[in-house]
Curated annotation (Swiss-Prot):
Pfam families: SRP1_TIP1. It comes from Saccharomyces cerevisiae (strain ATCC 204508 / S288c) (Baker's yeast). Keywords: Membrane, Transmembrane, Transmembrane helix. It is found in: Membrane. GO terms for molecular function: structural constituent of cell wall. Disulfide bonds: none annotated. Its main location: membrane. It is a single-pass membrane protein. This is Seripauperin-4.
Amino acid sequence: MVKLTSIAAGVAAIAATASATTTIAQSDERVNLVELGVYVSDIRAHLAQYYMFQAAHPTETYPVEVAEAVFNYGDFTTMLTGIAPDQVTRMITGVPWYSSRLKPAISKALSKDGIYTIAN
């Protein structure tokens, strides 16, 4: 017969290995920071494409914090705090490759961090 303490220990071990999940609003700063992290990484990986997009759309501007993060190869997440959620959404969804490249990468990064979003 299995002891109750053995079952409890097994359940605790399983719970400890399962990744914690958090459900938060899409406008939450934690979501914004993950989105911006993916965005900055994408700009770094496809800089020429972003330069061409900027040249074709000169009114599409980026906050100075994003530009600094792109060219500062250290930890940039603290630079990106305080950017308004609507500005984050405008930037990441405003490029033609949002659906094909950014959205899947953002979803993967949020999932990896155990973050799930709900509509505001």
